[in-house]
A protein has these predicted regions:
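Positively charged n-region of N-terminal signal peptides that target proteins for export
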Residues: 1-5
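Bacterial N-terminal signal peptides
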Residues: 7-19
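N-terminal glycine-/serine-/threonine-rich beta1-alpha1-beta2 phosphate-ribose binding loop
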Residues: 22-139, 165, 250, 313
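C-terminal helix-rich "cap/oligomerization" subdomain common to oxidoreductases
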Residues: 111, 116-121, 313-356
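Short helix/strand-capping hinge loops at secondary-structure junctions
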Residues: 140-142, 147-148
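A contiguous active-site-proximal alpha/beta segment in oxidoreductase catalytic domains
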Residues: 149-209, 219
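Rossmann-like dinucleotide-binding domain that binds NAD(P)(H)
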Residues: 198-266, 324-327, 331
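NAD(P)-dinucleotide binding in Rossmann-like oxidoreductases
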Residues: 239-241, 251-314, 318-324, 328, ...
Length: 356
């Protein structure tokens, strides 16, 4: 009898170890490069959640390289703050079964790349992104880069070009692009086919030149989402002490605008014009408006929609935003700067993707 019990117990233990080994072998190991951008914390909360289900199942942030930037005074402060949060995340649950293995902190990019299958770049200083991305892409690791993709159109093109050459999937995006209240305006039943869109959001006139793509990307990605994607052929830009106003004309004649708010209350939303009606868009983190009423008492989803897209990407290798669209947004911002320098002249858009 005792021998039978021992044999049964042994089989159970072996089965458990076998299951754990299979799970470990199947685990998609994610690494973070640079943690001084809050995205490092926001998305890890979803990717490392105990007993994750659905798209988040079978993956985890396992290692991070907390490199910072000497040119950003806040880099060290934020890096230390987010490192503390990441180190403690899911480490002291009420139920021990809910504990998650701690994130390993490494001291080199080479060491990070040895430990992971995929990488997320969250360095606050976008000037670092190109060099960081080159190492990741040459190592063949699927790569997501927190906005902005790069600090210049030239660096953005170089990153996407290398991704294509190495056949390594890579993309970047703002969480606003996937927020339900914005993405849900495409084919909204009260709007119909989108004819035009006016988006608005923050614009900091004191932003250093290297950060000029940081804030506008939230609203410009919202604009591209609602308008249905790329196709801009020309841009004009008017600039005053209170407003940065960019008007983009699509090749089919539709017009979209971006109002960058420099002074006064800052909100992020849009007005959408369609063949059935005109409606305000929702607000970040909430659902689509109904009869012009924007929901605010529904579930706040925040970063979850983009976290979902990142998880899908790491599982499938399919990017939700094509390189050509990302580079067109950089071309639009470049053309807007040129238009502003020429007193608001119409500037044709360059196709950065085809000329890469």
């Amino acid at each position: 009898m005792n021998r039978q019990l021992i044999t049964l117990a042994t089989l159970i233990v072996l089965e458990l170890f076998s299951t754990v080994s299979v799970q470990a072998a199947d685990l998609i190991r994610i690494g973070i490069l640079g943690i001084d951008n809050y995205g490092s914390v926001a998305y890890t909360e979803f990717l490392n959640k105990p007993h994750a289900e659905g798209v988040f199942e079978g993956m985890r942030v396992v290692a991070a390289y907390p490199i910072g930037s000497d040119d950003y005074p806040e880099s060290k402060t934020l890096g230390d703050k987010w490192k503390d949060q990441l180190s403690k995340m899911y480490q002291t649950p009420k139920d021990p079964k809910d504990a998650v293995p701690p994130i390993d902190w490494v001291d080199s990019l080479d060491e990070l790349l040895k430990r992971v299958d995929c990488v997320m770049i969250f360095s606050l200083d976008a000037r670092l992104h190109r060099k960081q991305a080159e190492s990741v892409l040459r190592a063949g690791k699927k790569l997501f880069i927190g906005r902005p993709l790069a600090s210049s159109p030239e660096d953005a093109v170089a990153i996407m070009k290398l991704a294509a050459e190495t056949k390594t999937p890579c993309w970047s995006g703002s969480q606003h692009r996937f927020s339900t209240g914005f993405a849900g305006m495409v084919n909204h039943p009260e709007v119909g086919k989108v004819i035009g869109c006016d988006v608005y959001g923050g614009w900091d006139p004191k932003t250093p030149e290297v950060d000029k793509f940081w804030l506008p990307l939230h609203s410009l990605e919202t604009l591209y989402t609602i308008m249905g994607g790329p196709g801009v052929v020309s841009v004009t830009c008017a600039s005053t002490p209170t407003t940065e106003s960019i008007t983009a004309t699509w090749k089919d004649g539709r017009v979209g605008t971006y109002r960058g708010i420099k002074e006064g209350a800052v909100k992020y939303s849009a007005t959408v014009f369609g063949d059935k009606g005109v409606s305000t868009a929702g607000i970040y983190g909430h659902g689509i408006p109904v009869m012009g009423v924007v929901p605010t008492n529904d579930e706040y989803v925040g970063y979850k929609p983009l976290a979902t897209e990142i998880a899908k990407f790491f599982k499938t290798g399919q990017v939700p935003v094509q390189p050509g669209e990302t580079l067109e947004i950089f071309a639009l911002m470049q053309a807007a700067e040129e238009s502003k320098a020429k007193g608001g002249a119409v500037v044709p858009l360059k196709n950065l993707w085809e000329t890469k």
